[in-house]
Amino acid sequence: MRKNILPAGLVFALGAGVSMNALAQAKPDVMVKQRQAVMTLQGKYLGPLVAVAQGKVPYNAAVVQRNAGFLDNLSRMPWDTFDPSTRNEKTRALPAIYENSAKFKEYANRLENETSKLVTLSRGGDEAAVKAQIGAIGKVCGACHDDFRQK
């Protein structure tokens, strides 16, 4: 009986290891869904900030700080899901993402930097500076979409 426990335990451990490894490797369609979810959330938290910057809604420091924090975290999430294995999935992502990955990564870095600046500015209370920074984020988003997203 004791002799069977070790091999059975070994088979279980190896099987669990293989299963865990398979789960760690995301499928292209899953990566696309993940990045689309992140982009949707970015829009959810950027939209109210744009309305503030445009003067369509009153400035609310608490909302600005909260949304800036969410955007800062979200700005770091989607980039690894633009894996070449997702190239043939049906999305609005242009092939240029994979053909000019250095420029795409530059936009990603700029977005991360601009959202970090917004977090810092939102804590300082300078409404004009915050509004200008929201505009800077919008410009990065727009430029990236112009170059890398289907119209």
Where are these regions (language model features)?
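Cleavable N-terminal signal peptides
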Residues: V11-F12, A22
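Sequence context surrounding c-type heme c attachment/ligation sites in exported
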Residues: D29-A61, N67-K151
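N-terminal signal peptide c-region/cleavage motif recognized by signal peptidases
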Residues: G17-N21
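Bacterial N-terminal signal peptides that target proteins for export
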Residues: M1-G9
